[in-house]
UniProtKB/Swiss-Prot annotation:
InterPro entries: AAA+_ATPase, ABC_transporter-like_ATP-bd, ABC_transptr_haem_export_CcmA, P-loop_NTPase. The keyword Nuclease does not apply. Gene3D superfamilies: P-loop containing nucleotide triphosphate hydrolases. GO terms for biological process: cytochrome complex assembly. ATP binds at G43, P44, N45, G46, A47, G48, K49, T50. It comes from Shewanella sp. (strain MR-7). This is Cytochrome c biogenesis ATP-binding export protein CcmA. It is found in: Cell inner membrane. The keyword Cell membrane applies. Part of the ABC transporter complex CcmAB involved in the biogenesis of c-type cytochromes; once thought to export heme, this seems not to be the case, but its exact role is uncertain. Responsible for energy coupling to the transport system. It is an enzyme of class 7 (translocase). The lineage of its organism: Bacteria, Pseudomonadati, Pseudomonadota, Gammaproteobacteria, Alteromonadales. It comes from the Bacteria.
Length: 216
């Protein structure tokens, strides 16, 4: 992973325009996201929050504009960016036919990790005792925590998370917020969407980028 101790800006957007089904979601959108930032993309449903996250993650192309990682166009540093990026979409990305432990093992190994204790990691997300349970038999909250468990064993600098608090109880949300603060304090950044109010991350620590629904 990239050593960014001497680098401040991690992810940048320059004049991004996104059009879906002939409707402009946002245009000429520019911003910098720095090491230590926790950034919430906010706005009503249909405003383009998920589309923006996917563009920042390099999973979708904007109609116009550029995205940068460490001041280099992500299309020219794709491998380096992918190594330093953790993207979790609003769908859990958990295979129902695998156990919680097998899902975590798969997700960590596919991300290049080979030295970890799945039971200890699952315990951190309150899944101790559910290691061998099929994901398809878990509750919605347990399903989501299975997906989020990889955050507790991850050294990517850029976390892009679409609705990470979905189906998570208040205690779980607070634990995630603490993890986000720790990650940012260690030189990473967190970019997320959520419809929930955060209790631990206060406004003086949270940056917000607002997208508004456009009718034309």
């Amino acid at each position: 992973m990239t050593n960014i101790t001497s680098v401040n800006t991690l992810v940048s957007a320059s004049k991004l325009t996104c059009i879906r089904e002939e409707r402009i979601l946002f245009d000429e959108l520019s911003f910098d996201i720095n090491a230590g930032d926790i950034v919430q993309i906010e706005g009503p449903n249909g405003a383009g929050k998920t589309s923006l996250l996917r563009i920042l993650a390099g999973l979708s192309r904007p109609y116009a504009g550029q995205t940068f990682y460490l001041n280099e166009d992500i299309n020219r540093c794709r491998d380096e960016y992918n190594e330093d990026l953790l993207y979790l979409g609003h769908l859990a990305g958990v295979k129902s036919e695998l156990t919680a432990e097998e899902n975590l093992n798969f997700n960590l190994r596919i991300s290049g990790y080979d030295d970890f204790d799945t039971a200890a990691i699952l315990a951190k997300v309150n899944l101790a005792g559910f290691e061998e349970a099929l994901a398809g038999h878990l509750s919605a909250g347990q399903h989501r925590r299975t997906a989020l468990a990889r955050l507790w064993h991850n050294d990517c600098k850029v976390w892009i998370l679409d609705e990470p608090f979905t189906a998570i109880d208040k205690k779980g949300v607070e634990e995630l917020e603490q993890l986000f603060i720790q990650h940012a304090d260690n030189g990473g950044c967190v970019i997320l969407t959520t419809h929930q109010d955060m209790g631990i991350i206060k406004d003086d620590r949270l940056r917000k980028i607002r997208l508004d629904y456009r009718f034309v």
